[in-house]
From Swiss-Prot:
GO terms for molecular function: thymidylate synthase activity. It is an enzyme of class 2 (transferase). The gene is thyA. Catalyzes the reductive methylation of 2'-deoxyuridine-5'-monophosphate (dUMP) to 2'-deoxythymidine-5'-monophosphate (dTMP) while utilizing 5,10-methylenetetrahydrofolate (mTHF) as the methyl donor and reductant in the reaction, yielding dihydrofolate (DHF) as a by-product. This enzymatic reaction provides an intracellular de novo source of dTMP, an essential precursor for DNA biosynthesis. It is found in: Cytoplasm. The active site is at C154. Homodimer. InterPro entries: Thymidate_synth/dCMP_Mease (IPR045097), Thymidate_synth/dCMP_Mease_dom (IPR023451), Thymidate_synth/dCMP_Mease_sf (IPR036926), Thymidylate_synthase (IPR000398), Thymidylate_synthase_AS (IPR020940). This is Thymidylate synthase. PROSITE patterns: THYMIDYLATE_SYNTHASE. DUMP binds at R133, R134, R178, S179, N180, D181, N189, H219, I220, Y221. HAMAP family: Thymidy_synth_bact. GO terms for biological process: dTMP biosynthetic process; dTTP biosynthetic process; methylation.
Amino acid sequence: MTKADQIFKANIQKIINEGSLSEQARPKYKDGRTAHSKYITGAFAEYDLAKGEFPITTLRPIPIKSAIKELFWIYQDQSNSLDVLEAKYNVHYWNEWEVDQTRTIGQRYGAVVKKHDIISKILKQLAENPWNRRNVISLWDYEAFEETKGLLPCAFQIMFDVRRVGEDLYLDASLTQRSNDILVAHHINAMQYVALQMMFAKHFGWKIGKFFYFVNNLHIYDNQFDQAQELLKRQPVASQPKLVLNVPDGTNFFDIKPDDFELQNYDPVKPQLHFDLAI
């Protein structure tokens, strides 16, 4: 059993046994019903990527390709356009969060990255002083929230630090997320930001180090408990999945493509489970 599978099962069981029930919930199911959830707060996990510990479960298939394409839309294209997401990456699930028939998700995610020129600033800071302690990407922009409607960012902050081990430099990353649907999105979000960590590391020719993941509200929606029980029953496969970025060290951040990523040794338990999403 992988470390990710151990953490996944432990968190599911903890939510079932110890979780609190949501009140005044905002999300809705497609039929209009309020999407309540059971949740825990303050969930934390640590993965040593350098030792092959990657935050992806083998208990069900995780759609990593579309997740990485979404990441590129946010941090390379720096876009909030649904047309760009569909035409360039053939990703459609963000249509559920279109704002007022604008074909955008409002001033969120990529729009905030572009507004503050965040990626260029982080690359410059790391180039000038890899050991600086100010490498913070934050998507939490109150001014943008007031400017337009839109889903507030779930995974909203990632920080980077560099460590020297012998002759090698390792890039660590810490992801903070305000809210996470553990059964559907937990490993999608984690692997997205591992991919981002790898892109920064490749840009500088560094090795990937540790990945820290903090979720403030980790929940299971009230229409997902059958799937949760099924996941607890499943026996994980023996393989150790690994995400690889197949470009030379020193490849510019903006020259990396989604197809440069390869998920190796991934043979998840099937069949896939169906989830009715809360919007």
